[in-house]
Amino acid sequence: SALENKKRLLEEELQTQYEKELYDILREWRMEQSQDLGYPPYIIASNKLLVDIIKARPKNFEELEKIKGMGRKKTKEYGREILLILENFSEASD
């Protein structure tokens, strides 16, 4: 299906094992947020946004906010947790 193709193409953008694991961790985090807040996961972050975050590797709120699809509101709401995940995971994998 078109949706499966889109998903496959997105996942092909994740080159390294590190990126693939980080993608899984971010998806897990998104699912928890989704359950806590009662929003569907894609409202919190699309798969594309998760991939873009992984590719950009933002180090602070300013860099995170510049990623297309994040914006000020999402950065304010989820930024701290996203940056924490990125920081913790990069240390673990070095």
List where the protein language model places each region.
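Accessory DNA-binding and partner-docking regions appended to nucleic-acid-acting proteins
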Residues: 1-94
